[in-house]
Amino acid sequence: MAETPTVKLKGKDRIVVWPAYFDADRSRSEGRKVPKRLAVRNPRLTELRHIAEKLGLNPKVQRDKRYPKRWWDDKGRLIVDKVESKRKTLLMIAEKLKERRES
């Protein structure tokens, strides 16, 4: 797995993707960014990385990062290329994640 300790986000050509964005057990105020119908329970960083690779988003894994709203939870994050708006990118990932979980 390609892990990078530091990734520069300057230039806004990269997007931070936290597993919490796709977690069906979280409310919007707790950090979920996708609609409930596209969210899954306990999304894993490895799943998100795999999906981002398939979508050609050039994901970089940062396992040592913690989602600010849940600083005690060390699930890590992904840094992906920005090909669309952040919302559209998250929806693309969420749709593929939902398909993967349902198959």
Curated annotation (Swiss-Prot):
GO biological process: SRP-dependent cotranslational protein targeting to membrane, signal sequence recognition
Keyword Transferase: no
Parts of the chain that traverse the membrane: none
Keywords noted in UniProt: Cytoplasm, Ribonucleoprotein, RNA-binding, Signal recognition particle
Predominant place of localization: cytoplasm
A GO CC annotation given for this chain: signal recognition particle
Record-given protein name: Signal recognition particle 19 kDa protein
